[in-house]
A protein has these predicted regions:
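Glycine-rich phosphate/pyrophosphate-handling loop used in enzymes and phosphotransfer proteins
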Residues: 1-246
Length: 246
């Protein structure tokens, strides 16, 4: 046995031991607290999926035509920065999607984002052809990110990118300017609030890109983000969201 190989054996054993401990630890947690569907509490076979198959099957696909109309209704043609829009599910005020969004946003469960992103990616793989060169999450301003501890759209984007087999590039888009919450603003005020909030960190050389956000309401945030990417030279910019608000 060579010197190098001999010296790497203990390191491998330690790493293997840590992996085993993690595996056993997770297994033990699953026995003590069996993973359950966020919405109906059914037991789940895979701890990393937030919802059971029946709850996922019960979600209603969002009509992309309605999303397109919302983008067209944005002030001064700003919605045209988005080449095509793909909202996955229609928002259900009392249903499974609400439970998932709530867990993602307010209950500090970022790992669900990646799993939900894979669901988005699976639907996109059927409709978005050819695939984009990279997936870019809509960023949070750093103050908001500090409050929440993570950006839920970045978690979704990672799952989408994984499923599409393309890189995820959270660093390509920045949000240097803080904005007010969009919740109680009119369509016009929402656009004014986010217009100019984003900037791209580098030249994007005609690359087709997919923006990922958690929810589409008027589309103003996605359009402002897409505009910043287009200003930096991106090719067509697509927008995918987990949910479409009423
Ligand atoms: Zn369920």
């Amino acid at each position: 046995m060579s010197q190098a190989l001999a010296s790497s054996v203990p390191g491998r054993l330690v790493r293997g031991g840590r992996r085993l401990a993690r595996h056993v630890g997770r297994g033990l947690l699953d026995v003590l607290y069996p993973p359950r569907c966020l919405a109906c509490q059914a037991r789940l076979s895979r701890a990393r999926a937030p919802l059971c198959a029946a709850c996922v099957a019960g979600l209603e696909r969002a009509p992309s035509e309605v999303a397109r109309q919302r983008l067209h209704a944005l002030p001064s043609g700003s919605g045209t920065a988005i080449a095509a829009v793909f909202p996955l599910w229609r928002f259900d005020p009392d249903g499974a999607l609400r439970a998932l969004q709530h867990a993602l946003k307010y209950q500090n469960r970022p790992r669900y984002g990646r799993a939900a992103g894979r669901w988005m990616g699976r639907a996109l793989a059927e409709t978005l052809s050819p695939p984009p060169e990279a997936v870019v999450p809509v960023p949070l301003h750093r103050t908001r990110k500090l409050e929440r501890g993570y950006n839920q759209s970045a978690r979704l984007a990672r799952g989408v990118a994984e499923r599409l087999g393309v890189p995820c590039r959270p660093g390509w888009l920045e949000r240097p300017h803080p904005t007010r919450s969009q919740t109680h603003l009119s369509r016009q005020a929402r656009w004014e609030n986010v217009d100019g909030a984003f900037s791209a960190s580098q030249s994007l050389d005609g690359r087709p890109l997919l923006l990922v956000d958690d929810v589409l309401t008027t589309g103003a945030t996605g359009a402002a983000a897409a505009r910043a990417l287009r200003h930096a030279g991106a090719g067509p910019v697509y927008l995918a969201t987990l949910a479409m608000a009423e």
